């Protein structure tokens, strides 16, 4: 599970005690020349707990954005980024960290990281549902 591979994940484990990788959108990926990256994971699964400042699920928001920071430790592969959509996220633990992969038709995303740090949450209502 992706949350288990993040440091600083205490709040996230309360928000989502179960697996969230079956339907995640990689909403943002950026990388700098030093190899640090930001990845935003959009989750359209209702959280296990209510957080008052976010409002009511399904009324005020229906998507949770998990903001993370990582350090690239190997390959980065992105093809057909604009075809990205909600899809299963595969997370594989390695000796050097983790590999995160998502594939949907021609869209393909794969990144090798030495680690992933939870940075924060934002929420929004996508107009669907």
Predicted features, each with a name:
Residues 1-129:
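Surface-exposed, interaction-prone regions used to assemble/regulate multi-protein complexes
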């Amino acid at each position: 599970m992706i949350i288990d591979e993040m440091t600083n994940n205490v709040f996230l484990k309360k928000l989502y005690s179960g697996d969230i990788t079956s339907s995640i959108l990689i909403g943002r990926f950026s990388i700098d020349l030093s190899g640090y990256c930001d990845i935003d994971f959009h989750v359209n699964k209702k959280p296990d707990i209510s957080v008052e400042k976010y409002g009511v699920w399904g009324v005020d928001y229906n998507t949770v954005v998990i903001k993370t920071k990582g350090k690239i430790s190997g390959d980065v592969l992105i093809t057909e980024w604009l075809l990205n959509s909600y899809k299963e996220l595969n997370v594989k633990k390695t000796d050097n960290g983790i590999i995160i992969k998502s594939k949907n038709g021609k869209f393909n995303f794969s990144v090798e990281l030495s680690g992933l740090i939870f940075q924060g949450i934002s929420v929004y209502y996508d107009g669907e549902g």
